[in-house]
Amino acid sequence: VDMCVTSPPYYNLRDYKNSGQIGAENTVKDFVENLCKVFDEIHRILKPTGSCWVNIGDTYDKKRLLQVPSRFEIAMCDRGWHLRNEIIWSKPNPQPISSKDRFWGNHEKFFWFVKDVKKYYFNRDAILVPQAEISIRRMFSKNNMEKRKDFNASDKEGFAISSNSQDKHYARMREEMGIDKEFNYEELIKSGKCPTRPEFDTWNVPSVTYKGAHFAVYPPELIEKPILSCCPEQGIVIDPFMGSG
């Protein structure tokens, strides 16, 4: 197996009407232990190049946040997994809450674990994103440097570098990109010549519902990035909790 992507049942939130179900344990400690036993088996069948992505939310009990994701994260590392990233899934459309005495939570954790820190597969190019428009416009401006005071020399305002030096720098960039000084941002992105950057570790992805489907489905956008970056072409992805989405 090349990769695991899953979202296990959250602690003490839903009753799936199954005997011995995960998520209905008496304590958080027992819940985390049962979860880790599942991922012990994933670790066993995963290739040395493999990754394991786990989305898990937290639970309140008697006005206390139980810190389920943090407990799970530490327990996984104690059992031989290596944590590469902790992604924040920020939801612009979170579920309403009835509580009147706390902030409205709109995020969940998405952990990226690897089996071997020296061998894991990662395709960085698959998840590069375009630079922001304001950053791109700096490359095409005649002189975009902010005026700033040089407190080491005097109180006079000046440029960090000369406009001539900056023009030459950006001229080289434009030449390498094969783009004229006048440009349209949308057209630049379509051309495939837009400068890129690595994806951030906070992802703004709306939650979704599908008529007739499982009531806790993945937004396709949420798992697209992990699969594109961590699973080789024609690779095998497993979800031990049989999630749909």
What are these model-derived regions, one by one?
Residues 1-245:
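Core catalytic lobe of class I
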